[in-house]
Regions:
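Active-site catalytic motif of lipid deacylating hydrolases and related acyltransferases
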Residues: 1-54
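Gly/Ala-rich beta-loop-alpha elbow adjacent to hydrolase catalytic centers
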Residues: 59-68
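A conserved short beta-strand
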Residues: 77-92
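Short beta-strand/loop motif that positions the catalytic acidic residue
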Residues: 105-106, 112-114, 118
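Short alpha-helix in the alpha/beta-hydrolase fold that links the catalytic acid
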Residues: 16-17, 97, 122-131
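Acidic catalytic loop of the alpha/beta-hydrolase fold
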Residues: 10-11, 91, 117-121, 148
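Post-His helix in hydrolase/transferase enzymes
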Residues: 41-42, 150-164
Length: 170
């Protein structure tokens, strides 16, 4: 199972979520439309607690990527891995006023997909996160795409598959 947090202008039926479902993944995508970060974090934490027994992959895109990164740090033992798509890790908003504290939790395999043409969230944000996180970054896909990653669904599916494979192998 993948729990996917959509972006600020995204929806629970966005193209990334649809692509993952079409590839056979069970995806739970809560509706965060109109919520600020603290509300998203609270809702996602509740949902993740409800599904902790499944050890899902936690995923997020843009603002949802920031939400997922925060939740992964709060409750790392509950997830198989972390999949971040153009995560907005540079935003300073409660509950995270210092973006440099964000890291992939120790031992949590993490995949990042970020477009080199992203004009909304600089790829440098993901590169700095990966550097702070060290060896827990399983894959980093620098794709020839923009912020929406509309041409990179195959990389997203590949990343999810790699994280799922970690579950099978362990």
């Amino acid at each position: 199972m993948i729990i996917f947090a959509h972006g600020l202008e995204g929806t629970p039926n966005g193209s990334k979520i649809q692509a993952l479902r079409a590839s056979g993944f069970e995806v739970l995508a809560p509706d965060f439309q109109g919520m600020v970060l603290s509300e998203r974090v609270a809702l996602l934490e509740t949902i993740c607690n409800q599904h902790a027994d499944k050890k899902p992959i936690l995923a997020g895109s843009s603002y949802g990527g920031l939400t997922a990164a925060i939740i992964a740090m709060r409750m790392p033992q509950q997830f198989t891995g972390l999949l971040l798509c153009a995560p907005a890790l540079h935003l300073k908003e409660a509950p995270v006023d210092d973006d440099t504290v964000l890291v992939a939790p120790n031992g949590m395999p993490t995949v990042i997909i970020h477009g080199i043409e992203d004009d909304i969230v600089p790829i440098s944000c993901s590169l700095e996160y990966a550097e702070r996180s060290g060896n827990d970054i399983l894959q980093f896909h620098k794709v020839d795409d923009g912020h929406r990653l509309s041409e990179s669904h195959s990389s997203i599916i590949e990343g999810a598959t790699a994280l799922y494979s970690q579950t099978i192998d362990s």
